[in-house]
Swiss-Prot record:
Residues engaged in binding NAD(+): D34, Q35, E36, Y37, D38, S83, L84, E114, R137, E170, K286, K310
GO molecular function: DNA binding; DNA ligase (NAD+) activity; metal ion binding
Group of enzyme by EC: ligase
GO biological process, one term: DNA repair
Known role: DNA ligase that catalyzes the formation of phosphodiester linkages between 5'-phosphoryl and 3'-hydroxyl groups in double-stranded DNA using NAD as a coenzyme and as the energy source for the reaction. It is essential for DNA replication and repair of damaged DNA.
Catalysed reactions, as listed in the record: NAD(+) + (deoxyribonucleotide)n-3'-hydroxyl + 5'-phospho-(deoxyribonucleotide)m = (deoxyribonucleotide)n+m + AMP + beta-nicotinamide D-nucleotide
Gene Ontology cellular-component annotations: cytosol
Protein name, UniProt field: DNA ligase
Species assigned in the record: Spiroplasma citri
Family: Belongs to the NAD-dependent DNA ligase family. LigA subfamily.
Catalytic residues in the record: K116
Amino acid sequence: MTFEQAKKRSLVLKEQLEKWNYEYYVNDNPSVSDQEYDRALQELIAIEQQYSELITIDSPTQRVSGQISEKFNKYVHTSPMLSLGNAFNYDDLIHFDEQIKEFTALPEIEYTCELKIDGLSISLVYDNHVLVMGATRGDGLTGEDVTINIKQIKSIPLRIDQPTLIVRGEVYLSVEEFNKINEERVKNGEFKFANPRNAAAGTLRQLDSTIVAKRKLNAFLYYYVNALQDGIQSQYEALQRLEQLKFKINPEYRYCSNIAAVWAYIQEYEPKRNQLGYEIDGIVIKVNNLNLYNRIGYTAKNPKWAIAYKFPAEVVVTKLLNIFPSVGRTGRITYNAVLEPIRIVGTIVRAATLHNADFITERDIRIGDNVQVKKAGDIIPEVINYVAARRQKNAQKWQEATHCPECNSLLERVEGEVDQYCINSVCPKKITRGLEHYCSRNAMNIEGISEKIIERLFKLEYLKSFSDLYQLEQYRAEIIELENFGEKSFENMITSINNSKNNSLERLLFALGIRHVGQKTAKLLARQFKTIDNLAAMNIEQLSIINDIGPIVAASVVDYFAIPANQQELALLRQNGVKMEYFATNQHLAQKFENYRFVITGVLSKSREYFKELIESYGGQVSESVSAKTTYLLAGTDAGNKLVKAQKLNVKIINEEEFQQLLSKED
């Protein structure tokens, strides 16, 4: 075959394969057999192997990949991917509708309703007709570039009949595919995924794209960014345009002329939620008229023109077979229920939380009882109570544990708390749970070291403390011989461990697992004290006077640094090169708004979350409410009550232009 013949044939094959992809993965109506599709794909692969210059990034062959990524690059979204506020009942919806009417001064509001897919949010960028970027939501401002994995999703077009587009949607797994994946994982001796959402999220973040290709991820697209600029006037019209561009759109969307029609839609789909073949956790309600969005505005985290109606948690009844305690990284004891398997919201549940000993004894829940179970937020199954009318005479009275289930140490209760604690500092489970937390994404962000790997390395006595992570190189020969490990996996793990040495102080403080110190508090402490030595030198009184640090947190921090074992561990971390100071990309800028407290209100050119991140990066704090301690109120249009309160308190009020002047002002 000559080059010209190959070129013509490859164009025909590309067009044909994309058409078949669309029929199969979007319309669910294939016109050819799998064998015919595979023959055409193999023919195109052969042509491109012969003439590599014919390979284009939108070729169907580029979906088939054996690429393994070292890590995913960060991607800054052109506009924030905001979360949605929630409604839980009819009254919440009426309140939402009344607010929209107040913002717009309209007597009736038209809406578009869509099913809320329980998956992982993504953003797709097309340039010159071709998919050039696929990114996860991340924190809403910055996500991860997972383009190579997005290309494995056959329902997502690689080329569209429009020069440019940014479109957002949800990656999900069907219940059928989820069950197949879990069956395969059980055969391979791996842990099962808890639910389809976790499976989809874990798959999309796989570094090995061949694994992604094997799992049949799917995607519904629903948000056309910059639709107004392209002449589209409504959300309903935007969805129709996305359909025309051959994106997979959830077919259940509907135009609703008013809030009563919205409620009717919700009532229709709530009983259908388990019959769809994929999981949903509510209904998304959006103002249909896109021209109203800027007038209605945004909060710091959510658009005011949309809301998510969350279905009430499904409650089922099943038999309680057993109760057993487990211990977490802080030593806190959680009681768990072993259940007769029952289906809740599309998944089989065999276990649920019973929280703490007081929860069980106050309700007199017994082994053998029929119990009510729900999934809290449709994620964590929990026992609510027992069914008194169905209690058997032989139901076994439960006794709370007195000793740790892992190390057999005597359990203790902390004054003022309902929980029991294992206080043994060398409890194996506390150590491994603590290591898992230390390595987690929001802490030191060490990749390639899972819960299973930590437990294996702990049993081999290679890993017993945080500082041991930085000495694993000495066990290279032994570790690469472990099952499911190897040279490449080891190198990736060591690289990530070494990278963690350069984290800023707030990550380390959160990773250490200091009681009551979450991400927000860790960031506040890091910015305030700059080094771990400065923080360790503080007493309870000095810490308590800091904004948002109360006496409980202060006491916990002081107690942590007073323990000799913790002092020794910090010294070892320092010896291994772990940085223990706070730093930003520019230290001078990071102090610009030091001791300044901002409140943000009204409609601005960007989301409140954008301005919050910006202020915090310059060392400032952002509060939700105006007080005498507020330094500046950053006010956009439609500022409302916060503006009135700021005026009464003589708080300095600035607009966006004045805020930019503050940023650029020389110190």
